[in-house]
Design a protein with these regions (language model features):
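Feature captures the catalytic cores and cofactor-binding loops of soluble hydro-lyases/lyases
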Residues: 1-58, 72-102, 106-114
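Channel- or pocket-lining gating/hinge segments that regulate access to a cavity or pore
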Residues: 68-70
Length: 114
């Protein structure tokens, strides 16, 4: 793993039980029985690639969870993170108002997020 935090695959993986036992997150397009023996080869190293049609380059942030994966290009990282933290703050205010008894329609009109 050499310091990797996880792996993003544009296709199926196998040996999923072993991968899960490693506690190493792997985001993939499915599970299948085939290996790459005789079919796989290294074409290039450390070059931009496309994964599910999205460009992924060295230095990009990749966030993944049970709901999916998002790639944040390094060039807009600061802007995207600032917007994400603003959204989290807004969601917290929304939740606080709902817990305080405010109606959903009012809270949505006030903040524009749920």
């Amino acid at each position: 793993m050499r310091g990797a935090a996880g792996a993003l695959m544009d296709g199926a993986v196998r040996d999923i039980k072993a991968i899960r036992a490693m506690n190493f997150p792997v985001f993939h397009g499915g599970i299948g029985p085939l290996d790459t023996k005789g079919r796989g080869r290294v074409m290039a190293i450390d070059v931009p690639v496309r994964c599910a049609g999205v460009k992924v380059a060295r230095g990009d942030l990749i966030f993944g969870d049970a709901d999916g994966v998002v790639v944040v290009p390094q060039a807009v990282e600061a802007q995207v993170l600032a917007l994400a933290f603003d959204k989290i703050k807004g969601e917290k205010r929304t939740l606080d108002d709902l817990r305080a008894g405010q109606k959903l329609g009012y809270v949505f009109a006030k903040y524009g997020i749920l």
